[in-house]
Amino acid sequence: MRLVKTLPLLLSLSAALGSASAFALPTDRDQPIRIQADNAHLDDKQGVATYTGDVIITQGSMMIKGNTVTMTRAANGDIDVVTSVGNLAYFEQQQSTAKPEKMKGWAVTIQYQAQKDTVILTDRAKVENEGNTTEGEKIVYNTKTQVATAGRGGNVTQPRQRIDMVIQPKKKAE
């Protein structure tokens, strides 16, 4: 599976919070991918891999956790969709070598759609970066255009009428 090129994009959600650095560490994509799970079901014919039971996927500074992670491949063999489901599914990644703090995100479902360059966090979605937070039923982020939308979701366990954002003041240079 060609996960190396696409999973780091899943974690570039920091631009949704106004971060100056919307990219992951450049060395992350060159690191091996490690998948740990209680069970794995791989269907090469259908191009689907499903990992269940305390799933942890790491690549460089990036980590994804969920109860179930499903990866589907497109006809050309590239990763098409990665879906992490949990209570809550979680991801983190260091965004720059100059800033060791990791950007973090939680949701019942976190999905990366490679063909659309889109990350979707649904149901109890929350993203934290550099002290800033965004919470809502659904957060959608386009990794190519770096445009984020937060708002109402479809089937959610805890409906929210509004999004909630906290933006920290910029620190003045001394």
Label every model-predicted segment:
Residues M1-E174:
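Mature-chain termini and adjacent capping regions
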